[in-house]
């Protein structure tokens, strides 16, 4: 019995992490307007910023593709104005980097680009503080969405 209790206590962080990720997915579906089960997210760190990308898993799923494009347009517009409510709602906390990204919003550019099955938001800046904040934000996204993307700058 004692061994079972020790095992359960050791596994508690794993269960808590899984429950948190399930919450991120569920809240994300509501906030973004498309299903995580039908789409794939990617986050990339670049020398001058980064990328937020989402694509429909099925190339014929035009509904998901169009919802992704609409969401990415909203993200680019909201982030440009310093509004980061969507990530805060999805993750239930302020992601790292957001306070600095809000403060330095005038030196960060957000450009949406359609992809064949979705869209991406290209984030760029020449400001070193803003760049560090963007990278913190994207690393958090990679971890919280469990995308498996590299956290290295390319």
Predicted regions mapped to residue ranges:
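Sec-dependent N-terminal signal peptides
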Residues: 3-12
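Generic structural signal for short, solvent-exposed loop/turn connectors between secondary structure elements
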Residues: 1-3, 17
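Intrinsically disordered, low-complexity terminal tails/loops enriched in metal-binding residues
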Residues: 16-154
């Amino acid at each position: 019995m004692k061994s079972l209790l020790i095992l359960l206590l050791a596994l508690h962080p794993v269960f808590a992490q899984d429950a948190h990720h399930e919450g991120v997915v569920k809240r994300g579906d509501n906030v973004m307007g498309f299903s995580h089960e039908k789409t794939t997210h990617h986050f990339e760190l670049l020398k001058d910023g980064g990328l937020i990308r989402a694509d429909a898993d099925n190339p014929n799923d035009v509904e998901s593709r169009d919802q992704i494009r609409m969401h990415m347009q909203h993200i680019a517009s909201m982030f440009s104005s310093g509004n980061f409510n969507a990530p805060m709602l999805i993750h239930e906390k302020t992601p790292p980097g957001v306070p600095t990204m809000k403060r330095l919003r005038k030196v960060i550019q957000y450009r949406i680009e359609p992809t064949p099955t979705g869209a991406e938001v290209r984030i760029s800046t020449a400001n070193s503080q803003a760049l560090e904040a963007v990278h913190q934000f994207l690393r958090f996204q990679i971890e919280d969405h469990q995308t498996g993307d590299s956290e290295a700058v390319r």
